[in-house]
Amino acid sequence: MELAGLKRLLLVTSLGCGDSWQYLPERARAAFGHEVRLKSLAESWLQTSTLAWTILRPAGLQDGIATGAAVLSQGKEMHGLVRRADVAACGLRLLTDEATAGQIYAIGDPSLSRA
């Protein structure tokens, strides 16, 4: 990627990746732990690259229109849901803000609940 001239990258992975593995419920680890581990490897690679990177770890993804109520968190346990549209909008903001380079964020929406 660096050889192609790419300078900025937003990587969207998931809750449970990297240092948030400890917060992933046992049931979720059993269901998709392997995929989370692979995403964690991608995060590790990116963190060692020369790119200006930002990592975004969404909670459980849900279809639907953006609520505008999604919140970002760093270094705190997060669970729940978030709309894909909110992840996209927030990701764009993070990508265009140079101050977020080298940072990892979780994103969830406290206004959403499982039916």
Regions found by a protein language model. Name each.
Residues 3-115:
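Oxidoreductase cofactor-interface core, primarily capturing Rossmann-like NAD(P)-dependent enzymes
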